[in-house]
């Protein structure tokens, strides 16, 4: 029971809330965004380098951290931060998206960019949504070797991606396109950036702070992204 409302089922699939005669004010802290943090971690995996991700709940990142570590990315936890590093070659792995605490479907497009550059053959299986591989065609234009087989996508790792003009078809696919553009050789353009801006606050500014060469072209909703040097 609670002095605000009565509830049953916390920690199960069903929560029942029983109304009360009167509610009163309170304070609630919104949890950090697991997917935004994971997106920057995936960018480190794809591009290399080092990033300190602050203001998170590391336990909420466990499934993402575990997969990146399988791929050879170093992740060190301290309090509410994760230090993410990648210097060597990426290793292959398989990923299946599941409801929390499994690997999040909203991280599927971002980690696939890293899998495109991993040695060997990797597989991603989408266990939550249908038709979530629309972005694959954009990655193949950049040189990725991917084939879709039902709910799974199979990746044959390549040495590098090549710059291209690509589209963001939705929020997370758009983030994946930005990561791919940062990892690719040459200058890329990503259009339909309104999808990306809907879910990432000041993504261009944050990436610039990390050393990315990225500019926004407001007139046609395009961002131009150059490889991190």
Regions found by a protein language model. Name each.
Residues 2-229:
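Short, structured segments at the rim of ligand-binding sites
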């Amino acid at each position: 029971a609670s002095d605000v409302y009565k509830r049953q089922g916390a920690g199960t699939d069903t929560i029942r809330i029983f109304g009360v005669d009167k509610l009163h004010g309170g304070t609630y802290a919104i949890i950090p965004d697991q997917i935004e943090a994971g997106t920057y971690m995936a960018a480190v995996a794809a591009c290399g380098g080092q990033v300190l991700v602050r203001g998170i709940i590391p336990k909420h990142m466990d499934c993402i951290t575990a997969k990146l570590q399988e791929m050879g990315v170093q992740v060190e936890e301290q309090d509410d931060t994760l230090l993410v590093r990648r210097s060597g070659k990426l290793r292959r792995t398989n990923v299946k998206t599941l409801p929390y605490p499994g690997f999040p479907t909203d991280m599927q497009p971002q980690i696939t960019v890293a899998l495109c550059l991993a040695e060997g053959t990797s597989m991603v299986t989408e266990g939550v949504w249908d038709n979530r591989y629309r972005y694959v065609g954009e990655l193949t234009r950049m040189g990725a070797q991917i084939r879709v087989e039902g709910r799974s996508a199979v990746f044959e790792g390549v040495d590098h991606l090549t710059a291209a003009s690509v589209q963001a078809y939705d929020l997370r696919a758009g983030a994946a396109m930005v990561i791919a553009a940062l990892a690719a050789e040459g200058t890329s353009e990503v259009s339909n950036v309104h999808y990306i801006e809907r879910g990432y606050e000041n993504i261009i500014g944050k990436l610039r702070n990390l050393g990315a060469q990225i500019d926004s072209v407001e007139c046609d909703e395009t961002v131009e992204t150059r490889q991190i040097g």
